[in-house]
UniProtKB/Swiss-Prot annotation:
This is Phenylcoumaran benzylic ether reductase 1. Its EC number is 1.23.1.-. GO terms for biological process: lignan biosynthetic process. Oxidoreductase involved in lignan biosynthesis. Catalyzes the NADPH-dependent reduction of phenylcoumaran benzylic ethers. Converts dehydrodiconiferyl alcohol (DDC) to isodihydrodehydrodiconiferyl alcohol (IDDDC), and dihydrodehydrodiconiferyl alcohol (DDDC) to tetrahydrodehydrodiconiferyl alcohol (TDDC). Plays an important role in the biosynthesis of secondary metabolites. In addition to the 8-5'-linked neolignan DDC, can reduce the 8-8'-linked lignans, pinoresinol, and lariciresinol, but with lower activities. Signal peptide: none annotated. InterPro entries: NAD(P)-bd_dom_sf, NmrA-like, NmrA-type/Isoflavone_red_sf, PCBER-like. Expressed in apical meristem and cotyledon veins of young seedlings. Expressed in vascular tissues of roots, leaves, stems and petals. Expressed in pollen grains. Expressed at low levels in cauline leaves and siliques. Disulfide bonds: none annotated. Induction: Induced by wounding.
Length: 308
Protein backbone atom coordinates (compact mmCIF):
# COMPACT_ATOMS: atom_id res chain seq x y z
CA UNK A 1 0.00 0.00 0.00
CA UNK A 2 1.38 3.39 -0.94
CA UNK A 3 1.94 5.87 1.87
CA UNK A 4 -0.45 8.79 2.23
CA UNK A 5 0.65 12.22 1.06
CA UNK A 6 1.91 14.72 3.58
CA UNK A 7 -0.44 17.72 3.48
CA UNK A 8 0.39 21.34 4.31
CA UNK A 9 -2.55 23.61 5.14
CA UNK A 10 -2.44 27.38 4.76
CA UNK A 11 -5.40 29.05 6.47
CA UNK A 12 -6.13 25.83 8.34
CA UNK A 13 -7.62 27.44 11.45
CA UNK A 14 -10.36 29.26 9.51
CA UNK A 15 -14.04 28.36 9.11
CA UNK A 16 -13.84 25.54 6.54
CA UNK A 17 -10.11 24.93 7.02
CA UNK A 18 -10.47 23.38 10.45
CA UNK A 19 -12.87 20.72 9.15
CA UNK A 20 -10.50 19.73 6.34
CA UNK A 21 -7.46 19.67 8.65
CA UNK A 22 -9.39 17.40 11.01
CA UNK A 23 -10.40 15.08 8.14
CA UNK A 24 -6.77 14.94 7.01
CA UNK A 25 -5.42 14.01 10.44
CA UNK A 26 -8.18 11.48 11.12
CA UNK A 27 -7.58 9.73 7.80
CA UNK A 28 -3.91 9.18 8.56
CA UNK A 29 -2.27 11.83 6.39
CA UNK A 30 0.76 13.47 8.01
CA UNK A 31 -0.80 16.91 8.52
CA UNK A 32 1.05 20.23 8.76
CA UNK A 33 -0.54 23.61 9.39
CA UNK A 34 1.26 26.88 8.64
CA UNK A 35 0.47 29.37 11.40
CA UNK A 36 1.62 32.72 12.66
CA UNK A 37 2.78 32.82 16.26
CA UNK A 38 -0.13 35.19 17.01
CA UNK A 39 -2.57 32.48 15.85
CA UNK A 40 -1.02 29.87 18.16
CA UNK A 41 -1.52 32.16 21.15
CA UNK A 42 -4.89 33.66 20.14
CA UNK A 43 -7.66 32.98 22.70
CA UNK A 44 -10.26 32.78 19.90
CA UNK A 45 -8.29 29.97 18.22
CA UNK A 46 -7.30 28.06 21.38
CA UNK A 47 -9.91 25.29 21.13
CA UNK A 48 -9.07 24.71 17.44
CA UNK A 49 -5.32 24.62 18.18
CA UNK A 50 -5.88 22.22 21.11
CA UNK A 51 -8.03 19.96 18.93
CA UNK A 52 -5.34 19.92 16.23
CA UNK A 53 -2.66 19.03 18.80
CA UNK A 54 -4.78 16.11 20.06
CA UNK A 55 -5.08 14.86 16.48
CA UNK A 56 -1.29 14.93 16.00
CA UNK A 57 -1.21 17.93 13.68
CA UNK A 58 2.22 19.55 13.33
CA UNK A 59 2.46 23.35 13.36
CA UNK A 60 4.95 25.23 11.19
CA UNK A 61 5.58 28.87 12.04
CA UNK A 62 5.41 31.08 9.00
CA UNK A 63 3.56 33.75 7.10
CA UNK A 64 2.30 34.42 3.58
CA UNK A 65 4.48 37.52 3.55
CA UNK A 66 7.62 35.58 4.51
CA UNK A 67 8.65 33.93 1.25
CA UNK A 68 11.51 31.91 2.75
CA UNK A 69 9.38 30.37 5.50
CA UNK A 70 6.68 29.64 2.92
CA UNK A 71 9.10 27.82 0.60
CA UNK A 72 10.67 25.88 3.49
CA UNK A 73 7.23 24.82 4.75
CA UNK A 74 6.09 23.74 1.28
CA UNK A 75 9.26 21.67 0.82
CA UNK A 76 8.13 19.52 3.76
CA UNK A 77 4.83 18.52 2.10
CA UNK A 78 3.55 16.66 -0.96
CA UNK A 79 0.23 18.49 -1.21
CA UNK A 80 -0.71 22.08 -0.34
CA UNK A 81 -4.30 22.98 0.59
CA UNK A 82 -5.14 26.67 0.91
CA UNK A 83 -8.26 27.60 2.86
CA UNK A 84 -7.43 31.28 3.32
CA UNK A 85 -10.36 33.61 3.88
CA UNK A 86 -12.00 36.12 1.57
CA UNK A 87 -9.58 38.98 2.37
CA UNK A 88 -6.50 36.86 1.56
CA UNK A 89 -7.62 35.29 -1.73
CA UNK A 90 -5.32 37.56 -3.75
CA UNK A 91 -2.35 36.65 -1.54
CA UNK A 92 -2.38 33.13 -3.00
CA UNK A 93 -0.07 34.33 -5.78
CA UNK A 94 2.59 34.18 -3.06
CA UNK A 95 1.76 30.52 -2.46
CA UNK A 96 1.94 29.80 -6.20
CA UNK A 97 5.34 31.49 -6.39
CA UNK A 98 6.61 29.49 -3.41
CA UNK A 99 5.27 26.22 -4.86
CA UNK A 100 7.13 26.91 -8.10
CA UNK A 101 10.36 27.58 -6.22
CA UNK A 102 10.00 24.55 -3.93
CA UNK A 103 9.46 22.30 -6.95
CA UNK A 104 8.16 19.27 -5.03
CA UNK A 105 4.39 19.75 -4.79
CA UNK A 106 2.30 16.95 -6.30
CA UNK A 107 -0.94 18.88 -6.03
CA UNK A 108 -2.32 22.27 -4.99
CA UNK A 109 -5.86 22.91 -3.76
CA UNK A 110 -6.40 26.69 -3.84
CA UNK A 111 -9.00 28.34 -1.60
CA UNK A 112 -12.22 27.62 -3.49
CA UNK A 113 -14.85 25.73 -1.48
CA UNK A 114 -17.93 27.41 -2.93
CA UNK A 115 -19.44 27.87 -6.38
CA UNK A 116 -17.55 26.96 -9.54
CA UNK A 117 -16.26 30.44 -10.33
CA UNK A 118 -15.89 29.67 -14.05
CA UNK A 119 -19.57 28.76 -14.42
CA UNK A 120 -21.58 31.36 -12.54
CA UNK A 121 -23.40 34.61 -13.20
CA UNK A 122 -22.76 37.06 -10.36
CA UNK A 123 -23.15 40.69 -9.40
CA UNK A 124 -21.02 42.72 -7.00
CA UNK A 125 -19.75 42.28 -4.35
CA UNK A 126 -19.55 38.48 -4.94
CA UNK A 127 -18.39 39.14 -8.51
CA UNK A 128 -14.99 40.53 -7.43
CA UNK A 129 -14.24 37.58 -5.14
CA UNK A 130 -15.15 35.12 -7.90
CA UNK A 131 -12.99 37.03 -10.38
CA UNK A 132 -10.02 36.79 -8.00
CA UNK A 133 -10.52 33.03 -7.63
CA UNK A 134 -10.77 32.64 -11.42
CA UNK A 135 -7.50 34.56 -11.92
CA UNK A 136 -5.81 32.31 -9.35
CA UNK A 137 -7.00 29.29 -11.36
CA UNK A 138 -5.59 30.68 -14.60
CA UNK A 139 -2.23 31.38 -12.92
CA UNK A 140 -2.02 27.84 -11.49
CA UNK A 141 -2.75 26.40 -14.93
CA UNK A 142 -0.29 28.70 -16.71
CA UNK A 143 2.45 27.72 -14.24
CA UNK A 144 1.77 24.02 -14.83
CA UNK A 145 1.06 23.28 -11.16
CA UNK A 146 -1.01 20.08 -10.65
CA UNK A 147 -4.31 21.06 -9.03
CA UNK A 148 -7.76 20.13 -7.78
CA UNK A 149 -10.45 22.79 -7.38
CA UNK A 150 -13.11 21.87 -4.82
CA UNK A 151 -16.57 23.26 -5.55
CA UNK A 152 -18.55 22.32 -2.44
CA UNK A 153 -21.39 24.81 -3.00
CA UNK A 154 -23.08 26.02 0.24
CA UNK A 155 -21.88 25.26 3.77
CA UNK A 156 -24.90 23.67 5.48
CA UNK A 157 -23.89 25.03 8.89
CA UNK A 158 -23.92 28.57 7.51
CA UNK A 159 -27.14 28.55 5.49
CA UNK A 160 -29.50 25.92 6.92
CA UNK A 161 -29.88 27.10 10.56
CA UNK A 162 -31.78 30.13 9.22
CA UNK A 163 -33.02 28.52 5.99
CA UNK A 164 -30.83 31.08 4.21
CA UNK A 165 -32.98 33.98 5.45
CA UNK A 166 -30.85 37.15 5.18
CA UNK A 167 -30.15 38.69 8.58
CA UNK A 168 -32.10 36.01 10.50
CA UNK A 169 -30.80 34.22 13.60
CA UNK A 170 -33.09 31.18 13.45
CA UNK A 171 -35.21 29.24 10.98
CA UNK A 172 -38.55 30.82 9.98
CA UNK A 173 -41.76 29.84 11.80
CA UNK A 174 -44.32 32.17 10.17
CA UNK A 175 -43.04 33.83 7.00
CA UNK A 176 -40.25 32.87 4.63
CA UNK A 177 -38.55 35.03 2.00
CA UNK A 178 -38.06 33.31 -1.35
CA UNK A 179 -35.65 35.01 -3.74
CA UNK A 180 -36.78 34.83 -7.35
CA UNK A 181 -39.26 32.06 -8.17
CA UNK A 182 -37.66 29.50 -5.84
CA UNK A 183 -37.12 26.91 -8.58
CA UNK A 184 -33.33 26.77 -9.29
CA UNK A 185 -31.66 23.96 -7.34
CA UNK A 186 -29.02 24.67 -4.71
CA UNK A 187 -26.65 22.30 -2.88
CA UNK A 188 -26.02 22.29 0.88
CA UNK A 189 -23.20 20.19 2.34
CA UNK A 190 -22.22 19.54 5.93
CA UNK A 191 -18.77 20.94 6.65
CA UNK A 192 -17.43 17.62 7.98
CA UNK A 193 -18.45 15.93 4.72
CA UNK A 194 -16.70 18.63 2.70
CA UNK A 195 -13.56 17.78 4.70
CA UNK A 196 -13.95 14.05 4.05
CA UNK A 197 -14.50 14.41 0.30
CA UNK A 198 -11.62 16.88 -0.07
CA UNK A 199 -9.15 14.56 1.66
CA UNK A 200 -10.37 11.56 -0.34
CA UNK A 201 -9.44 13.50 -3.48
CA UNK A 202 -5.85 14.26 -2.41
CA UNK A 203 -4.21 11.06 -3.70
CA UNK A 204 -6.88 10.16 -6.26
CA UNK A 205 -5.67 10.35 -9.88
CA UNK A 206 -9.29 10.83 -11.01
CA UNK A 207 -9.37 14.29 -9.41
CA UNK A 208 -6.01 15.48 -10.77
CA UNK A 209 -6.34 18.72 -12.78
CA UNK A 210 -10.11 18.54 -12.33
CA UNK A 211 -12.88 20.32 -10.44
CA UNK A 212 -14.28 18.17 -7.64
CA UNK A 213 -17.97 19.04 -7.33
CA UNK A 214 -19.68 18.05 -4.09
CA UNK A 215 -23.23 17.73 -5.39
CA UNK A 216 -24.88 14.77 -3.60
CA UNK A 217 -28.42 14.11 -4.87
CA UNK A 218 -29.94 14.08 -1.36
CA UNK A 219 -28.50 17.55 -0.68
CA UNK A 220 -29.74 19.23 -3.85
CA UNK A 221 -32.97 21.19 -3.39
CA UNK A 222 -34.89 24.00 -5.00
CA UNK A 223 -35.69 26.66 -2.42
CA UNK A 224 -39.40 25.89 -2.75
CA UNK A 225 -38.73 22.22 -1.99
CA UNK A 226 -36.48 23.17 0.93
CA UNK A 227 -39.28 25.28 2.42
CA UNK A 228 -41.75 22.41 1.91
CA UNK A 229 -39.39 20.02 3.70
CA UNK A 230 -39.11 22.48 6.59
CA UNK A 231 -42.89 22.94 6.71
CA UNK A 232 -43.34 19.16 6.99
CA UNK A 233 -40.90 19.06 9.89
CA UNK A 234 -42.56 21.85 11.90
CA UNK A 235 -46.10 20.84 10.91
CA UNK A 236 -46.98 24.29 9.67
CA UNK A 237 -47.45 26.09 6.34
CA UNK A 238 -45.40 29.28 6.07
CA UNK A 239 -46.38 32.44 4.22
CA UNK A 240 -44.01 32.60 1.24
CA UNK A 241 -42.95 36.10 0.26
CA UNK A 242 -41.46 36.06 -3.24
CA UNK A 243 -38.86 38.74 -3.99
CA UNK A 244 -38.47 39.50 -7.73
CA UNK A 245 -34.93 39.67 -9.11
CA UNK A 246 -35.13 43.43 -9.81
CA UNK A 247 -36.07 44.10 -6.19
CA UNK A 248 -33.23 41.88 -4.94
CA UNK A 249 -30.66 43.63 -7.16
CA UNK A 250 -31.79 46.99 -5.78
CA UNK A 251 -31.50 45.63 -2.23
CA UNK A 252 -27.94 44.41 -2.89
CA UNK A 253 -26.89 47.88 -4.07
CA UNK A 254 -28.48 49.56 -1.04
CA UNK A 255 -27.09 47.10 1.56
CA UNK A 256 -23.79 47.26 3.45
CA UNK A 257 -21.36 44.40 4.16
CA UNK A 258 -21.79 41.63 5.11
CA UNK A 259 -25.46 41.64 4.04
CA UNK A 260 -24.70 42.70 0.46
CA UNK A 261 -22.19 39.83 0.14
CA UNK A 262 -24.73 37.32 1.42
CA UNK A 263 -27.46 38.69 -0.87
CA UNK A 264 -25.21 38.62 -3.95
CA UNK A 265 -24.29 34.98 -3.20
CA UNK A 266 -27.97 34.13 -2.79
CA UNK A 267 -28.80 35.94 -6.05
CA UNK A 268 -26.18 33.85 -7.85
CA UNK A 269 -27.46 30.56 -6.43
CA UNK A 270 -31.19 30.90 -5.76
CA UNK A 271 -32.06 33.17 -8.70
CA UNK A 272 -29.46 32.28 -11.34
CA UNK A 273 -28.98 28.61 -10.39
CA UNK A 274 -25.24 28.98 -9.83
CA UNK A 275 -24.84 25.52 -8.28
CA UNK A 276 -26.68 23.38 -10.81
CA UNK A 277 -27.26 25.33 -14.03
CA UNK A 278 -24.65 23.23 -15.87
CA UNK A 279 -23.80 19.57 -16.35
CA UNK A 280 -20.54 18.22 -14.92
CA UNK A 281 -18.55 17.14 -17.97
CA UNK A 282 -15.73 14.55 -17.62
CA UNK A 283 -13.40 16.93 -19.47
CA UNK A 284 -13.32 19.33 -16.53
CA UNK A 285 -15.00 17.78 -13.50
CA UNK A 286 -16.03 14.85 -11.33
CA UNK A 287 -18.74 14.50 -8.67
CA UNK A 288 -17.72 13.49 -5.15
CA UNK A 289 -20.66 11.29 -4.11
CA UNK A 290 -20.23 9.29 -7.35
CA UNK A 291 -16.46 8.92 -6.88
CA UNK A 292 -16.78 7.97 -3.21
CA UNK A 293 -20.09 6.09 -2.78
CA UNK A 294 -18.88 4.63 0.54
CA UNK A 295 -18.93 8.06 2.21
CA UNK A 296 -22.12 8.28 4.26
CA UNK A 297 -22.81 11.97 3.86
CA UNK A 298 -25.29 13.78 6.10
CA UNK A 299 -28.43 14.72 4.18
CA UNK A 300 -30.24 18.07 4.28
CA UNK A 301 -33.25 16.21 5.67
CA UNK A 302 -31.15 14.96 8.61
CA UNK A 303 -29.47 18.33 9.17
CA UNK A 304 -32.79 20.20 9.39
CA UNK A 305 -34.01 17.90 12.19
CA UNK A 306 -31.72 19.65 14.69
CA UNK A 307 -33.40 23.02 14.04
CA UNK A 308 -36.98 21.84 14.64
Amino acid sequence: MTSKSKILFIGGTGYIGKYIVEASARSGHPTLVLVRNSTLTSPSRSSTIENFKNLGVQFLLGDLDDHTSLVNSIKQADVVISTVGHSLLGHQYKIISAIKEAGNVKRFFPSEFGNDVDRVFTVEPAKSAYATKAKIRRTIEAEGIPYTYVSCNFFAGYFLPTLAQPGATSAPRDKVIVLGDGNPKAVFNKEEDIGTYTINAVDDPRTLNKILYIRPPMNTYSFNDLVSLWENKIGKTLERIYVPEEQLLKQIIESSPPLNVMLSLCHCVFVKGGHTSFEIEPSFGVEASELYPDVKYTTVDEILNQYV
